[in-house]
From Swiss-Prot:
The keyword NADP does not apply. This is DISARM protein DrmA. The lineage of its organism: Bacteria, Bacillati, Bacillota, Bacilli, Bacillales. It is found in: Cytoplasm. Residues 73-95 are annotated as: Disordered. It comes from Bacillus paralicheniformis (strain ATCC 9945a / NCIMB 11709 / CD-2).
Length: 1119
């Protein structure tokens, strides 16, 4: 995009903000204003009302919050609705209580809080506001007399002498308006905390006599920078994060308003100004390398993926990679450490950067090894795959006029330096199974939309190729096949979109394998391991039976599966062919599902698309990469087949596939028979990737940290006396205290963030802030209106933004730049609040748009017709359709409005979106960053945050709007998880004990083998748990081991006394009702009369719920 185009998008955005301010506040002071409606109705913010002015509530206090009970979810809802609801209800429950006033109180004052040195004598206060007077006029159009309101601007200037009072002073401006000033000296400093208030003291119940478009500006009479930054004024705030953000100072905060400023330096500002709709634009990050005088400008295409893939000269590739490392080293050496006062922080920065450089160089050395060039061959394979998947992406856009082979011959893609560096620093940990680097959890921390996914997909491609090159060298394990990588997410929307990216990469792997006849005999494939509400868990669920599956239900399951992969990852063709093997007949027992492209010229019309969607097939086919939501691992204690995911197989059936150790297998297959032969176990998963790490926190992180004990142990290879654990990689755009969280959840003491920060947050070498004048990015604006309900505020904002884009379509020049702002994304913290907006869209917003058309004489009105939701109420099968609709540009049935909850805060990558309205400050800053980052990814974005003035937390963020937004990542809250705490152990300790034993020992695998526990040596289990707890929380070791022993004793006791003990049976089956069965485990949702320890079947059920019954007719006088 050219600079001229960026300026045009910026111009459209500026018009939208200006229109919003005009409608909510009124015109600027240098414009005239004559209106036909009362000013108190025309404008809703920027107003200081007379003291006794009030308005009645429009409905009730609940109306402020949209406190309507949301509808029940539709049938067929997926299992993660519970987690989504829990999150949304938790948001509602934890919000600050709103003062239960019977009336909305109007604001009658505003203020600015700032810091000045003791030597500052005067502050100049400039005050201005609009005063409206009414008059009558005959309207020839309406043929009647109308009332006109005309504005007059009142301006005053007052010099505040700080030495003339001790603590407080009241300075009259007029008979009805005054300045109230207070000052307080900070202990042990020469700094005063000064607060200046503008107060409307008029007593009048007529709100039209208010002060409109109020402004308060503080300066020095000589224009000096006298306002001290908070970090300098309050020395107690000097932590490492403050050090990094020292060039983004906070100079003031507001009272009842926000504050903007003009800064002379990083320590002093020369002007502070009140703002009722404050704005702040955040910078985008450039991944281009800085110019280096020793190495010059990096040529375009220098890190060409195609050139790396085709390189025959190993030395040439190594030279390019060394050039990257040399530039980084040069940058580190030139950091101006002598000019930075905080030496402790400086030493930390240099140490972290040097450690990263050392690991990058070790990765390059591995690739430079000419005697053992397998790493270099795998590196070329990685580049071939990444180039091919990009060619597939381009082929998908226009498969009518080009071919995949044609696109492969083109050179379009190159590595971003940070992506290549991250791959290089991870190579040793992937190649050398005994390397110390394998113990490090590498955290890829990069802003949303920066290319994190491509970086770790490159690592995946390298490992897949490298593992196959060593397929014949292992005696204990088979490496040609088996699950190599576990890729985990938390939310289903994220998993759906990332699955599609991964599927294209894996398709490129398989395309390359088949074209080169190298890299093993087993296919490269991906398994989508998610809940039963997304796809069936068993193939039997695709066949009619006499109990509960009739033809209609089976056909619905067919339809659900067919909605998962919508288009071919290679050519983009839609309407794929799903082959239900051996036939589509609903009465035929299914043996598998294969998906083919219907485009005859596509590679995957001859061979199936390498993806598996049904749990049973995943256990049998063992796809190379398994992508799942984290909660799916709660299935481990329930199903012995899950052992196969960790390579624990010992048989192969020609019809079914791989069979887990200890698993019961039917030999007959009814007819004809299939042969079964013994096989070596596969090497367990070598890499575990956790995307959006910041979401693994709180109750979910606590429980998941317990299950991670099992996952890491089952992914550990035992070769002789060596215990070779898997490599962990995590990625996030928002996290704080990552080292603590990684230790609690993953049990790893070492965490390394990449890229490590430099001496300032603006520049880490691999990522540098861009200049806003040249690269406009994402503009935030805040609205906080007292005296009106949130309903009123929201409908006014939505109406203005929607109508403005319609009006601008008539501008021949600007109409080409409307598309990013044509679809409004409405973000809500709960379904309850969203429900109120749904009703507004149906009626009130439409009426307000009509009003705007008449008021501002627009020639056309915006009509709202396409307005879907993205919430937990939407079934997974419908989500891809909504995402597809979001991609549609203006004039192509584009969506008008999309209402969403925190489901979209990660993973919704739609580049065209540029407009969002966030209702209420999200509970966490990380969620605020993630959600607002859904817009403005490719074009300058606009985010309007609507604050609730009756929530103290919202007001706090609004009053510190500029300070908060200019250092957003600084305010990210630390994440927490407490595995092995007492209550957490109640939830999962018995489950991980069952999972470890059942999946490690064939004698305990089958459902009826639960009774065999009495014959087992349990020291292995105890050692694993003890080591884990010692790492995670040493203080809980004794209690945990006692807790574990209690459960094992109970299990053994039952195994001795109950011959029919099994892990689980469904109490609703006929055999369970008439038989004498006993079970070890029970689902949380089941009745407890059948016994069994309540056990999680999904991590969506982490927190319990209670039912509340209200009996009508109860009379307290009867007590």
């Amino acid at each position: 995009m050219s600079k001229a185009e960026r300026e045009m998008y910026k111009k459209v955005r500026r018009i939208m903000v200006s229109d919003l301010k005009r409608d909510l506040i009124g015109p600027a002071h240098d414009e005239s204003d004559v209106i036909y409606e009362a000013p108190s109705q025309a404008y809703i913010t920027g107003i200081l009302y007379p003291l006794e002015s009030e308005v009645e509530t429009e409905k009730s206090l609940e109306d402020v919050q949209f406190a309507d009970v949301y509808d029940e979810p539709e049938s067929g809802m997926e299992e993660d609705v519970e987690q989504q609801r829990n999150s949304e209800l938790e948001q509602e429950a934890e919000e600050e209580k709103i003062t239960p006033n019977k009336k909305f109180k109007h604001q009658n004052s505003l203020g600015i809080r700032c810091y000045v040195r003791e030597t500052t004598d005067h502050i100049r206060a400039s005050i201005a506001w609009g005063r409206y007077t009414s008059s009558k006029k005959f309207d020839s159009e309406r043929k009647r007399e109308v009332i006109l309101w005309t504005r007059q601007i009142e301006c005053f200037e007052e010099y505040i002498s700080l030495s003339s009072f001790d603590q407080n002073i009241d300075i009259p401006i007029t008979q009805e308006v005054s300045l109230v000033v207070s000052k307080k000296k900070l202990s042990g400093t020469d700094v005063f905390l000064v607060s200046v208030f503008l107060v409307n003291k008029r007593v009048d119940k007529n709100s039209n006599n208010a002060m409109f478009q109020c402004e308060l500006t503080l300066t020095h009479e000589e224009g000096k920078g006298i306002f001290l930054c908070e970090n300098e004024a309050r020395k107690d705030k000097n932590d490492f994060s403050e050090f990094l953000y020292r060039n983004k100072p906070v100079f003031a905060k507001g009272f009842g308003c926000a504050v903007t400023w003009k800064a002379e330096s990083s320590n002093y500002a020369s002007e502070l100004k009140s703002a009722f709709i404050p704005e702040h634009e955040v910078e985008s990050m450039s991944t281009d390398l800085p110019y280096d005088e020793n190495y010059g400008e990096l040529p375009k295409g220098y890190f060409s993926i195609k050139q790396f893939a085709e390189a025959d000269d190993q030395r040439e590739t190594i030279d390019k990679l060394n050039n990257l490392a040399n530039r980084y080293e040069s940058w580190i050496n030139k950091l101006p450490v002598d000019k930075v006062a905080n030496k402790e922080a400086t030493e930390r920065v240099i140490k972290d950067c040097q450690a990263t450089l050392t690991r990058i160089r070790r990765g390059i050395q591995l690739l430079a090894n000419e005697e053992n060039n397998k790493a270099f061959v795998a590196f070329k394979f990685m580049n071939t795959v990444m180039h091919t998947q990009d060619a597939m992406k381009r082929y998908s856009r226009n498969n009518k006029t080009t071919t995949l082979e044609t696109e492969i011959r083109k050179e379009n893609l190159e590595w971003r330096p940070f992506q290549l560096a991250f791959i290089l620093l991870n190579l040793e940990g992937l190649v050398d199974l005994k390397s110390k680097d394998r113990k490090i959890v590498d955290l890829l921390w990069f802003p949303t939309g920066g290319g994190k996914t491509e970086a770790y997909l490159g690592i995946c491609a390298f490992l897949l190729g490298y593992r196959r090159l060593f397929a014949s060298t292992s005696s204990a394990y088979e490496r040609d096949g088996g699950v190599t990588i576990l890729l985990r997410y938390t939310l289903r929307l994220l998993t759906t979109q990332q699955r599609d990216r991964l599927m294209r990469m894996i398709s490129a792997c398989e395309y390359t394998r088949q074209k080169t006849n190298a890299f093993g005999q087993s296919e490269f494939s991906v398994g989508f391991w998610v809940g039963a509400q997304v796809t069936v868990n068993k193939l039997d669920d695709l066949t009619e039976n006499e109990y509960y599956l009739d033809r209609d239900k089976v056909l619905k399951e067919y339809e659900k599966i067919e909605k998962q992969v919508i288009e071919c990852p290679c050519c983009g063709t839609k309407g794929l062919e799903y082959k239900f093997l051996p036939s589509r007949d609903t009465k035929t027992k299914k043996t598998g599902i294969k998906i083919f492209c219907t485009n005859e010229s596509c590679f995957f019309s001859k061979t199936h698309i390498p993806v598996y969607l049904v749990d049973e097939e995943i256990y049998r086919k063992l796809p190379t990469v398994v992508i799942s939501t984290v909660d799916k691992f709660a299935r481990l204690p329930w199903d012995e087949k899950t052992a196969a995911l960790f390579g624990k197989v010992n048989r192969f059936c020609e019809r079914c596939g791989y069979i887990a150790e200890g698993e019961k297998h039917e030999k007959s297959h009814r007819n004809p028979k299939a042969s079964v032969h013994d096989v070596k176990p596969f090497y367990p998963p070598e890499l575990i990737i956790q995307d959006e790490l910041h979401l693994i926190t709180g109750p979910l992180g606590t429980v998941y940290g317990g299950y991670e004990t099992v996952i890491e142990e089952l992914s550990t290879a035992h070769e002789g006396e060596d215990y070779l654990k898997p490599k962990y990689i995590a990625a996030t755009a928002t996290i704080k205290n990552a080292e603590v969280q990684v230790e609690k959840v993953f049990g790893r003491k070492l965490t390394q963030q990449f890229p490590p920060p430099g001496l300032k947050v603006e520049d880490s070498f691999f990522a540098r802030e861009r200049n806003l004048d040249e690269f406009p990015f994402r503009l935030y604006a805040g609205v906080c209106v007292s005296g009106h309900s949130m309903k009123t505020v929201l409908l006014r904002i939505y109406a203005v933004l929607l109508q403005t884009t319609e009006h601008l379509l008539e501008d021949e020049e600007l109409s080409k730049y409307i598309d990013p702002y044509r679809t409004l994304v409405g973000y809500f913290n709960s379904i309850r609040e969203l429900g109120g907006a749904v009703r507004l869209l149906e009626d009130d917003i439409k009426k307000r748009i009509q009003t705007l058309q008449k008021k501002y004489k627009y020639s056309k009105q915006r009509y709202i017709s396409r307005k879907p939701e993205l919430t937990s109420r939407v079934p997974s099968s419908r989500i891809p359709k909504v995402l597809e609709q979001l991609e549609k540009e203006i004039g192509n049935e584009e969506l008008d409005v999309v209402l969403a909850t925190n489901m979209i805060s990660v993973g919704m990558d739609v580049d065209r979106l540029g407009l969002m309205v966030i209702t209420g400050q999200p509970k966490q800053t990380s969620e605020y960053i993630q959600s607002s980052s859904r817009v403005g990814r490719s074009k300058p974005g606009l985010v309007i945050t609507v604050y609730n003035p009756y929530r103290p937390r919202d007001m706090s963020h609004y009053q510190n709007f500029k300070g908060y937004h200019q250092r957003l990542y600084h305010f990210v809250e630390g994440t927490t998880a407490t595995p092995y705490a007492s209550r957490a152990r109640d939830r999962f300790l018995h489950a991980i004990a069952v999972a470890l034993l059942r999946l490690s020992y064939p004698e305990l695998a089958k459902n009826l083998d639960a009774k065999n526990i009495k014959d087992m040596d349990l020291n292995y289990l105890k050692d694993v748990v003890k080591k884990r707890v010692s790492t995670v929380e040493y203080r809980n070791v004794s209690d945990t081991m006692e807790h574990l022993q209690h459960f094992l004793d109970e299990w053994i006791s039952r195994a001795v006394s109950e011959d029919n003990l099994q892990y689980y049976f469904n109490p609703k089956t006929r055999s369970a009702r008439i038989g004498n069965q006993s079970r070890l485990l029970a689902r949380f949702s089941e009745e407890k009369k059948h016994g069994g320890k309540p056990t999680l079947d999904s991590m969506r059920q982490v927190e319990g719920t209670s039912s509340l019954y209200i009996y009508e007719g109860w009379n307290s006088s009867e007590e």
